[in-house]
Amino acid sequence: DIVVLEDNPYRELRFSGTATDSFGKELGEQCCMLGTFSKIVAPGMRIGWVCVRNKALREKLLSYKATADLHTNIFSQLVLAQYLADNDIDAHIEKTKVLYKHKAELMMDCMRKYLPEGVEFTPTEGGMFLWAKLPNGMSAVDLYRVALTKGVAICPGDPFYEKARNVSTFRINYSNSSDEVIEKGIRLLGEACEELLAK
């Protein structure tokens, strides 16, 4: 028996394109679905959820969870429960998707405008990040260092690969920045890319 672990923390934040079905619909007891409130309610609210139909698997997960950290922060759970009782979470998610779509489109427009030729990015249909790629042979860790001197933070792709180091991919977040900060940040990131390309 194989259990499929479906980890889709950005599922609710898809703002364009075609929504994807959960594996859980097809796989039933063979699927374990994970989700989080940190992406849809508040980043500091490090509370997630697990949906498992298989009773034996659920019992094992509960046992592992209990030994991993004894228990999840009770106060945070109570605050979240009260928030969910007092607010329409679906309306909140819809509002967030509209905001994130605007920010993502602005960031992509700025990337087209300010990033030098050879730097590519993957258009997004949801979530809170954009992925970009430097020309082959260039390290996103090097870009991170140059960009940081300009006050711009990116996340090099290295932690997202099992063994690769000094990869050319990097991730940038648009969820918590104003329009002005997004434009200024991407302009400065473009300058950092130019400096790196000139070396």
Where do the PLM segments sit?
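PLP-dependent class I/II
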Residues: 1-199
